[in-house]
Swiss-Prot record:
Organism, scientific name: Pyropia yezoensis
Family annotation (Pfam families): Ribosomal_L32p (PF01783)
Region of interest (Disordered), ranges: 1-26
Protein name listed in UniProt: Large ribosomal subunit protein bL32c
InterPro entries xref list: Ribosomal_bL32 (IPR002677), Ribosomal_bL32_plant/cyanobact (IPR044958), Ribosomal_zn-bd (IPR011332)
Biased composition (Basic residues): 1-19
Membership in a protein family: Belongs to the bacterial ribosomal protein bL32 family.
Gene giving rise to this polypeptide: rpl32
Length: 59
């Protein structure tokens, strides 16, 4: 017969939730930073075709 496990304490639940939220915050900051660097063309991780890119941004 299946027996329910012991309940997780509030402290453990809150610690896991805080860890999860902190990881999400870090990823959001990285994504925003990457987006800003791409928009200002200061990123080194991407190769731009400057002839096509200048046409799209000149509008």
């Amino acid at each position: 017969m299946a027996v329910p496990k012991k309940r997780t304490s509030k402290a453990k639940k809150n610690a896991r939730k805080a860890n999860w939220k902190n990881q999400a915050k870090t990823e959001a900051q990285r994504a925003l930073s990457l987006a800003k660097s791409v928009l200002t063309r200061k990123s080194n991780g991407f190769i731009y075709n400057l002839t096509e890119a200048s046409d799209t941004f000149s509008d």
